[in-house]
Amino acid sequence: MEYKLVIGLEIHIQLGLRTKAFCGCKNEFGGVPNSRICPICLGLPGSLPSVNVELINSAILAGHATNSNIRHVVKFDRKHYYYPDLPKGYQISQNDKPICERGSLLIETSSGLKKINIIRIHMEEDSGKSLHLLDSENQSYIDFNRSGAPLLEIVSAPDISSGDEAVAFLTSLREIFRYLDLSECNMENGSFRCDVNVNLIITESGVEHKTPIAEIKNLNSFKSIKAAIEYEELRQKEEWVQFRKTLDSCGKHTRGFDDKNGVTVVQRDKETVSDYRYFQEPDLPLIEIDDFYIANIKKIKLIEFPFDARVRLKDQYGLSDFDVITLTTDKHLLRYFEEAAINASDPKKVANWILSEVLSVLNDKGISVLEFNLFPSYITELVEFIVAGKISGKMAKKVFLEMMSREVPASVIISENQLEQISDKFVIRQIVFEVLNENPKSIELYKKGKDHAIKFMMGQIMKKSSGKINPILANEILLQSLSNV
């Protein structure tokens, strides 16, 4: 039996706009329950929605970033379903005419670049949030603060073939939205949510069979998404062997992911389009957007996207794949590096220092690079001292700590404390000769193959120079001198 795993993703991204999609209420996470609502949020009789123009602008930018075709007429529809946290009984969304269609993203896989097509991007509003208390079986609460929050839904084509590819696509999409400042894309607070559609195409005796599509929900991390896909692949393969269920006979159903046990659990049959009874939203007019308007919106956010930045960084600075991926996860970190690298004699060493020492500080303090208290030029100068052999890497770390404490450049600290390494070969030879003359027994031990004698003599050299001698040069000159003794 041969089979192919087929995966499509539906991603909901809550936009970081100041106000909600169709009213003037603040669009913020958390807060006192039901403190940011109005008659429009609750669908009260007589309330009329109005479109937040920034929702349309955000959709245009998302379409541009994903190489999508952008529609010139915006139409909203009512999507009907009944949940306690949907007070109107319908959601304002887009059905047959999404604002963006036929886009794509390139992702990096183990076998190279792969194009993942995007079927559509459409605008809609979020629902409220139901809260079920563990200590109460008979009570639930509803917070409508999220009701009406602006969303974009991105629907990928079923071009994804593994859990790793799904995570790569989601990572790329998240980076783009963060680069554009459209959303925090934080799965913990619900601003980045993903449903995964999975099934298998099984080939037996030259005949293809499609297994029923499972739409998996309750996925709260990229790790969960990958685990759910891998579990579902095994489950559907076993189900085919036992029951030979097909897509034609069983259709599509919804499953939830049990993160604790690593399994998916049946929830319900999946609704069809007709179940939602779509029709055009009568309270919102058609909105026309011309090419000039779209071009102006694109110009506002004329930025380099992560994938393009990675290619450029490798070509321009010779950085590794790991380095460029890490640097481009945060556009502010990338900008910090480029400002530090612009006048550096060795940009790769600057990158190494930022990705090790600077990132370590940021992670320990739980801050972003925007809150870091050293200018990029300070890092450049510190690395130049290392490259020139004026201070050791070990000493540089001590200098770095004092730089952060005092918020002064490395040159000030090195000058005040006379920390500059001795790299003059003539001076180093003099110190080496002194140590050799004072330690004839160590020379004899070295000749007998005792390696610890070298370590002892290097220790004496460092002691005589108060730790300021260049250890690499000192070791070279010591070995040369011993070969001539």
UniProtKB/Swiss-Prot annotation:
It comes from the Bacteria. Its EC number is 6.3.5.-. It catalyses: L-glutamyl-tRNA(Gln) + L-glutamine + ATP + H2O = L-glutaminyl-tRNA(Gln) + L-glutamate + ADP + phosphate + H(+); L-aspartyl-tRNA(Asn) + L-glutamine + ATP + H2O = L-asparaginyl-tRNA(Asn) + L-glutamate + ADP + phosphate + 2 H(+). Transmembrane segments: none annotated. It holds the Pfam family GatB_Yqey. GO terms for molecular function: asparaginyl-tRNA synthase (glutamine-hydrolyzing) activity; ATP binding; glutaminyl-tRNA synthase (glutamine-hydrolyzing) activity. Keywords: ATP-binding, Ligase, Nucleotide-binding, Protein biosynthesis. GO terms for biological process: glutaminyl-tRNAGln biosynthesis via transamidation; translation. Heterotrimer of A, B and C subunits. PANTHER family: GLUTAMYL-TRNA GLN AMIDOTRANSFERASE SUBUNIT B MITOCHONDRIAL AND PROKARYOTIC PET112-RELATED, GLUTAMYL-TRNA(GLN) AMIDOTRANSFERASE SUBUNIT B, MITOCHONDRIAL. Allows the formation of correctly charged Asn-tRNA(Asn) or Gln-tRNA(Gln) through the transamidation of misacylated Asp-tRNA(Asn) or Glu-tRNA(Gln) in organisms which lack either or both of asparaginyl-tRNA or glutaminyl-tRNA synthetases. The reaction takes place in the presence of glutamine and ATP through an activated phospho-Asp-tRNA(Asn) or phospho-Glu-tRNA(Gln). This is Aspartyl/glutamyl-tRNA(Asn/Gln) amidotransferase subunit B.
